[in-house]
């Protein structure tokens, strides 16, 4: 068997040419759910540093994040809010995957570190502006005392 072959399929098809599979688990562990997935507990993702290698900081993410536009859209008859995979792929290609049918998907969880760094950048700018405002206030008081 191939590790990229289906190990378990719920639906009326077992290959990429039949798009009616509702749930598919591959031998390599990849899992596909073809519609909404409701979880009553937590969804947790392994993130232990011991599992990772070549760890580097993302650095500045705000300029790239500003190139992404949140969208409201209809998909499968339901109103949704999200992003377009094509836009994400332009700035964060590692967050976009493609299935056998060349349909793109976004790793929304992967946007969290991007948002954390952008938030830090904005907070640093806010702090810098607050310090600048205090200096301006002091200078205005000095100028007022000269008059």
Which sequence ranges carry the predicted segments?
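Periplasmic N-terminal gating module of Gram-negative TonB-dependent outer-membrane receptors
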Residues: 53-67
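Active-site-adjacent helical/loop segments in soluble small-molecule enzymes
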Residues: 88
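Low-complexity, small-hydrophobic/phenylalanine-enriched stretches
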Residues: 8, 23-39, 43-45, 49, ...
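Residue-level detector of conserved, well-ordered beta-strand and adjacent loop positions
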Residues: 11, 56, 74
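Active-site nucleophile-His-acid catalytic modules used for acyl/amide transfer and hydrolysis
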Residues: 68-76
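Residues that recognize and position ribonucleotide moieties
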Residues: 81-82
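Right-handed beta-helix
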Residues: 1-21, 47, 93-94
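C-terminal intramolecular chaperone/auto-processing assembly modules
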Residues: 32, 47-57, 94, 98-147
């Amino acid at each position: 068997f191939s590790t990229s072959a289906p190990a378990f399929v719920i639906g009326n098809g077992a290959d990429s040419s039949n798009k009616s599979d509702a749930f598919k688990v591959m031998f390599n562990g990849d899992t596909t759910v073809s519609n909404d997935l409701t979880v009553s507990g937590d969804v947790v993702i392994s993130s232990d540093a011991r599992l990772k290698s070549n760890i580097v900081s993302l650095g500045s993410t705000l300029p790239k994040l500003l190139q992404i536009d949140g969208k409201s859209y209809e998909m499968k008859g339901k109103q949704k809010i999200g992003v377009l995979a094509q836009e994400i792929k332009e700035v964060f290609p590692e967050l976009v995957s493609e299935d056998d049918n060349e349909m793109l998907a976004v790793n929304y969880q992967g946007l969290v570190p991007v948002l954390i760094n952008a938030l830090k950048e904005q907070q640093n700018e806010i702090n810098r502006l607050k310090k600048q405002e205090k200096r301006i206030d002091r200078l205005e008081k000095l100028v007022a005392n000269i008059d």
